[in-house]
Every structure is written in C-alpha cells, then in structure tokens.
UniProtKB/Swiss-Prot annotation:
Record: residues binding ATP: 239
Details of cofactor binding: Binds 1 zinc ion per subunit.
Native organism: Corynebacterium efficiens (strain DSM 44549 / YS-314 / AJ 12310 / JCM 11189 / NBRC 100395)
MF-aspect GO terms: ATP binding; glutamate-tRNA ligase activity; zinc ion binding
EC supergroup of this enzyme: ligase
Key words, A-Z: Aminoacyl-tRNA synthetase, ATP-binding, Ligase, Metal-binding, Nucleotide-binding, Zinc
This protein's name: Glutamyl-Q tRNA(Asp) synthetase
GO cellular component: cytosol
Amino acid sequence: MAGRYAPSPSGDLHFGNLRTALLAWVFARHDGRDFLMRVEDIDEQRSTMESAERQLSDLSMLGLDWDGDVLYQSSRHDAYRAAIAQLDTYECYCSRRDIQEASRAPHAKPGMYPGTCRELTPGQRAERRAGLAAQNRHPAIRLRAEVDSFTVVDRLRGEVTGDVDDFILLRGGQEPGWAYNLAVVVDDAFQGVDQVVRGDDLLDSVARQAYLCTLLGAAIPEYVHVPLVLNARGQRLAKRDGAVTLREMLVDAPLTHIISSLAASLGYEGISTPVELLAVFDPGALSLEPFIFTGLNGSATDRMDK
C-alpha cells in the first residue's frame, strides 16, 4: 500500500502546494502506507531538473520523508508506449479551434470531445494525416471510450460521477507529448499506489483516470480530493500572489512557524513538525472548504465558510 506526491517541476512549491504535499504525506502515514515521491516532468518545455531538485529539497526541509527512490516520468516513455498499445485508440487531427467550434453545436457537452475523428474512413485519415504532415505536425492519439460516464468513490466526497469522452493519450502538434491522464494512471499502477491525495481541481479528471485503470487492468486507487488554497480575492493561489513559496517565506519566518501555519490551515494549532501533526490528525475532520491564504501573519483559520 502506498500514497504519493507528484509535483510538476516548473517552479518552486508555494503554500498551497506544500499544504497538499503535507496532506498526502499525513494521509499515507496515518493509514500505515508507504509514501512515494514522483516527479511529473513529461512536459519538457516547462520542466527543469533544477526545479525538481529545489522542490525535493523543500519537501525534505519541511520534514516530509518518502520511501524508495524518486520516480521521474521522463524515464517512463517506454511504459507509456506499451500502455497505448493495449488500448483501443485512434488518431485525431482536430485543432483546438476545431474542437471549440464543435463544442458550440446544439446538444454538445462543454469540455467533451465530440468524436469528430472517431469514425473517419481510412482514406479520410490518410488525407488529414498528410495535411498535418505538410505543416510539420503530428496527430493526437485518443482513447476510443466505450462509456460516457464513470463513478468513483472519493474518501471525502463519497460517490463522484464524471464524464468520460474519447480523451487524449498522446498530444499532437509539432512536439507530441504524453497526456497527464495516461501517465498518471500508468505510473500509479507501476508504483503500487493505492491512495491518491491531491487538489480538488483535479476532480474533473478522476472519472477518466479510473476508467482507464479498468482498461489497463489496474486497481482503482482510493481518491482523496482535498480543497485548494485561494488568495484573498478567492482565486487559486499562485506564485504571483507574493511571498508564498517556502524559500520566500523563510526570509521572514522560521521553518517551525511555516509548518505551524500549514497545520493551522488544516485546523490544528500548536504544531511545529509533520510528525506532531500525524499524532493528532483526524481525516474525518478535514474541512471541504477552500482555505484563504492572507499571509503567514493572517488568520490561520480563514475559510470560505466563515
């Protein structure tokens, strides 16, 4: 049994990222699971090894330990290719504009691929493939889904039913890249991850990922979608909101104060280490409302419901 944290190395981790990492760690340790670390660096244009090293250093500094070696998605291309070979897929030649225009059609579901390329003839595929090649572009690869919805059980939210469409497994364009939905499912199965704690902004993708688990013969993990950290304007916290990364906060506050603020955002006062939080952590007491971050000197209990 294992939980995991899987940051994308595109910059330093901010207060919201650190809070989710702490929750992933404390859920896993509370339940007696191993805690694994994975670097989701398949987006080569945004990912850097420097960012990965800084993130891992920050998490270690915070007091989060993990079991085994760090897994880098950039080393997993063969596994993703093997997974696609097991699935019923087809090439998609649509541009983003094509999909946006199709979504405006009557009865179209927002955010759902309408299946434009699903039933093309071999001749139509050859013609469209040649058209993309002339632009030095590659088609995307989509899953040929046999369901339009899927239900999972989230530990905090109960049954969650989400839409499933013919979602992308391999992005097209001039530089093809593996899609998050494919990589995360393949890697969770490979690592034996049976608990996924992450931000609730990813709740919309859980049905697709759980359905993909069934197609690949992988067990569906326990999902725990935790609330995000928002800024004072009610928007998702971002690095542009000021001194919110660990290294920035350490300029003005000791590490114990930062950990105390993280724990207080979860409803626990007087905590100065993750181990202290683990000793008193109650998964059932976790608020489902977003936390409003107003700085380390702001109220540690500001939530949308107060």
